[in-house]
């Protein structure tokens, strides 16, 4: 039996490479016959896809060559993936879930992203005990870590990078800002800008929800309206938007566009002269420049997570050794600890 993870993050691959890896990993979700053949009848997987990482956590009872196959598929794209199995896999996910492996150390969004990835996977397909246990314990230990360890508020945030970028391009608090999607990142950016005095904040979401901002219906959305700044954060592609084109985006001179989606909402061979288009690679580079040695102050916290991972790994080994083979694969866990 093998339990492991293969993936890449902002450290190993640029945005273009991460997009290609995400498309390859999504093939496992799109083709159940292919994934069953790849992982075996008793195997399965969970995809963790965020702005800064693309990972596949897998379990297989029979195929011990899965790791090498995954590494080969990802490496063929020019990326340099990492891989962990067993205890190292536990330690990695625990560190990821705690936020200690994030671009901005200690950020909290990753806990929710891991939770949603797990819920999606167990809703879409049967998961074996190993993956249920791994993700339940990672979520529990990540939550415990945040409650027991005092983490200083990040000096550098994505919100601060956005604010500085708007200042750099001459935007003011009177400008009109459009947020596509009521996503977590858009909400954080809007909250930060609102605190800085920005008042013309408008959201456009597919969902009909009550929010503390002005809204525009999707049916009434026009990119030719005088929005000075547009934030794409809805996990949609360009084809999902009526009237979205390079021409419509460039219809407002000096417009600044942030594309937080990975894969990107749209890709441009070169940025037009009349508008400024910025993606997550730009955000990552700006954050890393400001942080310099970004993980220097977090090393002291890692033994805490390593100890928690070892404890849960030992529990997993004991439990899995007593589970009949007929119960290795289960569609519903007995206990969900979030």
Curated annotation (Swiss-Prot):
Q: Which domain of life is it from?
A: Bacteria
Q: Where is this site: Important for activity?
A: 92
A biological process (GO) of this protein is:
protoporphyrinogen IX biosynthetic process
Q: Which residues form the active site?
A: 51 (nucleophile)
Q: In which pathway does it act?
A: Porphyrin-containing compound metabolism; protoporphyrin-IX biosynthesis; 5-aminolevulinate from L-glutamyl-tRNA(Glu): step 1/2
Entries under InterPro entries matching the protein: 4pyrrol_synth_GluRdtase, 4pyrrol_synth_GluRdtase_N, GluRdtase_CS, GluRdtase_N_sf
Q: Which UniProt keywords apply?
A: NADP, Oxidoreductase, Porphyrin biosynthesis
Is Magnesium given among the entry's keywords?
no
Residues that bind substrate: 50-53, 102, 107-109, 113
Pfam families in the record: GlutR_N
Under catalytic activity, the entry for this protein gives: (S)-4-amino-5-oxopentanoate + tRNA(Glu) + NADP(+) = L-glutamyl-tRNA(Glu) + NADPH + H(+)
- The record lists NADP(+) as bound by 181-186
Q: Which GO terms describe its molecular function?
A: glutamyl-tRNA reductase activity; NADP binding
Q: What is its EC number?
A: 1.2.1.70
Written domain comment of the UniProt record = Possesses an unusual extended V-shaped dimeric structure with each monomer consisting of three distinct domains arranged along a curved 'spinal' alpha-helix. The N-terminal catalytic domain specifically recognizes the glutamate moiety of the substrate. The second domain is the NADPH-binding domain, and the third C-terminal domain is responsible for dimerization.
Family listed: Belongs to the glutamyl-tRNA reductase family.
Q: Which PANTHER family match?
A: GLUTAMYL-TRNA REDUCTASE 1, CHLOROPLASTIC
Q: What does this protein do?
A: Catalyzes the NADPH-dependent reduction of glutamyl-tRNA(Glu) to glutamate 1-semialdehyde (GSA).
Q: How does it assemble?
A: Homodimer.
Misc. comment: During catalysis, the active site Cys acts as a nucleophile attacking the alpha-carbonyl group of tRNA-bound glutamate with the formation of a thioester intermediate between enzyme and glutamate, and the concomitant release of tRNA(Glu). The thioester intermediate is finally reduced by direct hydride transfer from NADPH, to form the product GSA.
- Report the protein name in the record: Glutamyl-tRNA reductase
């Amino acid at each position: 039996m093998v339990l492991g993870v293969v993936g890449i993050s902002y450290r190993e691959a640029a945005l273009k490479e991460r997009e290609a890896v995400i498309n390859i990993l999504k093939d496992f979700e799109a083709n159940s016959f292919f994934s069953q053949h790849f992982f075996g009848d008793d195997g399965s997987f969970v995809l963790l896809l965020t702005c800064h990482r693309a990972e596949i956590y897998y379990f297989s009872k029979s195929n011990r060559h899965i790791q090498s196959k995954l590494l080969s598929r990802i490496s063929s794209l020019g990326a340099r993936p990492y891989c962990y199995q067993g205890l190292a896999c536990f330690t990695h996910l625990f560190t990821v879930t705690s936020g200690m492996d994030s671009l901005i150390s200690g950020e909290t969004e990753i806990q929710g992203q891991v939770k949603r990835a797990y819920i999606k996977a167990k809703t879409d397909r049967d998961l074996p005990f190993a993956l249920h246990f791994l993700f339940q314990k990672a979520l529990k230990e990540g939550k415990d870590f945040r409650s027991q360890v005092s983490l200083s508020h990040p000096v550098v945030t994505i919100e601060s990078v956005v604010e500085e970028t708007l200042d750099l391009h001459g935007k003011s608090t009177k400008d009109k800002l459009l947020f596509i999607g009521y996503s977590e990142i858009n909400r954080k950016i809007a909250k930060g800008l609102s605190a800085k005095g920005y008042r013309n904040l408008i959201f456009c979401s597919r969902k009909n929800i009550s929010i503390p901002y002005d809204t525009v219906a999707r049916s009434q959305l026009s990119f030719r309206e005088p929005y000075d700044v547009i934030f794409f954060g809805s996990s949609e592609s360009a084809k999902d938007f009526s009237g979205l084109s390079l021409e419509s985006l460039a219809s407002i001179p000096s417009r600044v566009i942030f594309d937080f989606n990975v894969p990107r909402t749209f890709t441009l061979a070169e940025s037009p002269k009349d508008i400024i288009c910025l993606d997550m690679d730009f955000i990552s580079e700006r954050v890393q420049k400001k942080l310099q040695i970004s993980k220097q102050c977090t090393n002291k916290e890692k033994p805490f997570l390593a100890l928690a991972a070892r404890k849960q790994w030992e529990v997993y080994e004991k439990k899995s050794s007593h589970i009949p083979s007929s119960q290795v694969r289960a569609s519903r866990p007995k206990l969900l600890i979030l």
